[in-house]
Amino acid sequence: MADQMIFKRCEIKYMLDITQAELLKNQMKQYMTADEHGVSTICSLYFDTPDYLLIQRSMEHPVYKEKLRLRSYGMADKDTTVFVELKKKYESVVYKRRIAMTEDEAERYLLFHEKVKDTQITREIDYCLKNYKKLAPAVMLSYEREAFYAKDDHEFRITFDQNILWRNYDLSLCKGIYGEAILDKNKVLMEVKTAGAIPLWMVHFLTENQIYKTSFSKYATAYRTIYAREQRRSCPPEKFFVFTGDEVVQQAIKC
């Protein structure tokens, strides 16, 4: 899927423990094939405004939302091919546009607005860059992904993400793969990606194992931690605002 540039699909997330994930992988063998790349490391550099406008809007669960990120498969250097991705979501359907270029070209394009080849995709990315003022690297995310696709429908995919790390410093794909963990070691984030319906065998497995969809977001989870830490530094000692789920509640704590 690394060479595909346009996507339209539904993406449904589930939180599993390792035992559930291994049980599902075993059952998947008759229906799905492992991606040829096996387990891969994905690095995503998310862009946002200085006040995190994009992720804040996303967390409000609007009908339409979008994210801009720079992605590599494994740690990059200046000559590595990376992908500038604009991910939009409208009424639960994901539309993803991306273009490939070197890390150095991507940095000059996104940070210094150097011209690139004019295409429909670059025009959409350019509009995003103009619409949100002062977009800059905000959060670096990395994780290990194991991907599978259906034997009879390559548009149906399942991915398992583990070792999800984040940081809001050293914001470059070339700076290494490290950061703070988002999930417990026993947890696995599963994503079902499909342009159509979920197969019955998958529905039966989820039902039998009482596995339910979640709205978990890697970037939003990292942002909640950033927000909480900023509140600790700036709030009066007797009061502090923290995120609970997608809402902000006031708690009396000691800073």
Q: Where are each of the predicted segments found?
A:
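Phosphate-end processing signature that detects enzymes handling 5′-triphosphorylated RNA
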Residues: 1-255
